[in-house]
């Protein structure tokens, strides 16, 4: 075997680079968070707590075992914010940005890895798209910070500048981390701003902007408001996203928040409709919501955002393809269709695989935590959905969990961020299927 063939055999695939890249950043972040400099008390953070926080930040989840605002120092918060930004953009995108800034030429292998990392349809134009992502991200985060600056500076003085920057990045990256907690008010999220339209609207817009995907924004910027010119995927994402905001908001409005004034009730319903799809902020007391509303939120958490975005979950396109395939079956059509375009059968198979994997992870993780911690299954399923969907919403039990249960949530967050199919492709990338096919036989379904 020649030296070239040996090198090619042991070369990492793009999917392997992605999962190892995330793991490396998480480990480095955990080590930094263990430093006494990272905490307000100047103490060393246990490794499992630092690992949990770093995983939650890189996987843009928002679940925490220590209150971010009161436990971590400004240095620790800066480490968390850096991890959120890297996780939101993607490890490969951040690495590529440094290569672009240094003037280095991006190889074809690196372009292919970048394509897989941001779910781009082709390798061509990937460098231009990466520049667009970087410029767009920092511009939108800057606008979000400036919008929230007057409110936070009014409430926190000069520290409000850091507050505005932190929450803008956290919202755009769909992370859900907040630094509003104090020793007397732990884990508040945005409950103190439930009636503040500036915070509500700004955070919601940042979440939606980060969650619809960079490719969708590229399509919008290129074709402006000419919806008919958009790619089929962009149309599906926009329609599905709008549907998943409006319908749950109407449900929440009529089922919960009776005690709020009309304006605040509308804001609360909209916010709780937007945030479960991987953002993790909340403006109301979640355990006080009805069981039906919490069930709807679990569904939204599992669905998540859109491909190539800062969000996690099984993705809006997965849901849309499965529903379109069901509609095609009822209408006795050969394939799912969107906007006069046919969906390839491989996409339907991939969507079904993703759904199966997410449901298995969600249910398996929730059952394990419920059995180990002796807690109600419904609460544990909520935390599991929040972890695997990289959301960050909690009913308050995550900080109380023992280490084995925390390790389960860490695994769910990691798998939810890198994606189950990425792990499968990374494991089988060097294997090839044979040409032989087994005999076919019918099986009864339903």
What are these regions (language model features)?
Residues 1-446:
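Membrane-proximal intracellular helices of multi-pass ion channels
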């Amino acid at each position: 075997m020649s030296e070239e063939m040996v090198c090619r055999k042991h070369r990492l695939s793009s999917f392997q680079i992605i999962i190892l890249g995330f793991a490396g950043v998480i480990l480095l972040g955990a080590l930094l968070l263990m430093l006494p400099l990272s905490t307000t008390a100047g103490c060393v953070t246990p490794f499992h707590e630092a690992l949990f926080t770093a995983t939650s930040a890189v996987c843009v989840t928002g679940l925490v075992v220590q209150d971010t605002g009161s436990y971590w120092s400004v240095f620790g918060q800066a480490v968390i914010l850096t991890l959120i930004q890297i996780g939101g953009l993607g490890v490969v995108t951040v690495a590529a940005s440094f290569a672009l800034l240094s003037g280095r030429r991006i190889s074809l292998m690196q372009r292919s890895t970048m394509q897989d990392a941001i779910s781009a349809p082709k390798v061509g134009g990937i460098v231009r798209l990466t520049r667009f992502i970087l410029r767009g991200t920092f511009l939108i985060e800057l606008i979000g910070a400036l919008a929230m600056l007057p409110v936070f500076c009014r409430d926190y003085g000069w520290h409000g500048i850091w507050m505005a920057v932190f929450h803008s990045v956290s919202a755009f990256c769909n992370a859900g981390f907040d630094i509003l907690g104090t020793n007397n008010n732990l884990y508040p999220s945005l409950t103190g701003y439930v009636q503040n339209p500036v915070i509500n609207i700004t955070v919601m817009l940042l979440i939606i902007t980060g969650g619809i995907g960079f490719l969708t924004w590229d399509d919008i910027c290129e074709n402006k408001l000419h919806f008919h010119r958009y790619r089929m995927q962009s149309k599906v994402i926009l329609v599905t996203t709008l549907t998943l905001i409006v319908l749950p908001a109407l449900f929440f409005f009529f089922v919960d928040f009776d005690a709020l004034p009309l304006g605040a009730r509308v804001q609360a319903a909209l916010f709780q409709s937007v945030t479960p799809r991987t953002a993790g902020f909340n403006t109301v007391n979640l355990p006080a919501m009805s069981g039906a509303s919490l069930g709807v939120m679990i569904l939204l958490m599992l669905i998540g955002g859109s491909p190539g975005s800062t969000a996690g979950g099984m993705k809006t396109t997965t849901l849309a393809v499965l529903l379109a395939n069901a509609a095609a079956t009822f209408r006795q059509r050969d394939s799912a269709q969107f906007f006069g375009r046919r969906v390839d059968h491989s996409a339907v198979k991939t969507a079904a695989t993703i759904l199966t994997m997410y449901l298995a992870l969600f249910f398996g993780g929730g059952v394990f935590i419920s059995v180990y911690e002796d807690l109600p299954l419904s609460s544990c399923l909520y935390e599991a959905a929040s972890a695997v969907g990289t959301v960050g919403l909690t009913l308050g039990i995550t900080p109380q969990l023992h280490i084995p249960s925390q390790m389960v949530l860490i695994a769910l967050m990691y798998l939810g961020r890198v994606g189950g199919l990425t792990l499968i492709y990374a494991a089988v990338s060097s294997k090839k299927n044979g040409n032989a096919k087994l005999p076919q036989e019918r099986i009864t379904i339903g």
